[in-house]
Amino acid sequence: MINPIKVYIFILSFSLIYANENNHTAIDVMKKVLQAPKPTSSISEINLEIVRKKMGKTKRKTRAFLRYDKQYNSGNYSKKSLVKFLKPKSIYGTGLLTWIGADGSSDQWFFLPKLKVAKRVKSKEKGKSFMSTDFIYEDLENRGIDDDHYVIDGYEKIGEHACVVLFSKPVRNSAYWGKKIFVDQTLWQIRKIEYFSSKSIISKTLFLNEIVNKGGYWLPTVL
């Protein structure tokens, strides 16, 4: 029996000014991140806390779901995943199935248990919020390394962890103007992502606060 890995996620929405770009070997950094060893199959129990700050007020809401992932080394698909919501009770059992093709293409379907209906997610819908989580459908699929252009944007520390900072701009259609990605230079794992809705506005930030070794694989446990 596979014991699910418990993951806690905190997303903070706010605005920030972005500046500065330097072009070095950003693509090599992303290759190290994407080529890091991953388990062939995994089950994660994820608790998501969404924090919004507006007009001096802080609002919080929570979501919980199970995520099943399966990696493929050959065939028509590179990865398949299923997200199934546990909390809140009003959306219990709601699911999102994602299939990633070997060519980087993706197909998604969501399931509404109360209506017993499954529906395919259209390309134009991938920028929409998924079940009011602050995730959009695009966040729950994999983008290929050629789908974005990367440049090195500096070096910073996240806590005690030295990181190389990348800035990515989409080549393939994306709901985001760009992303700022903080990569741990020791583990080659992502520590933080800032999602830009425009050149000067960050719409949300994902923090990966704890990464531990499980069975020889580096996995985030607190986000």
Language model features with spans:
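Sec-dependent signal peptide recognition
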Residues: 2-11
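Hydrophobic h-region of N-terminal signal peptides that target proteins for export
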Residues: 11-20
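N-terminal mature ectodomain segment of secretory-pathway/periplasmic proteins
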Residues: 21-114
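A short, amphipathic edge element
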Residues: 24-28, 62, 140-152, 200-205
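Short, structured patches in soluble enzyme cores that scaffold and shape functional sites
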Residues: 48, 85-87, 110-112, 122-125, ...
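Short amphipathic beta-strand and strand-loop transition segments with alternating hydrophobic
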Residues: 66-73, 151-157, 209-211
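Short solvent-exposed loop/turn micro-motifs enriched in small/polar/acidic residues
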Residues: 91, 102-103, 148, 174-176, ...
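Gly/Pro-enriched, hydrophobic low-complexity segments
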Residues: 97, 107-111, 117-119, 128-130, ...
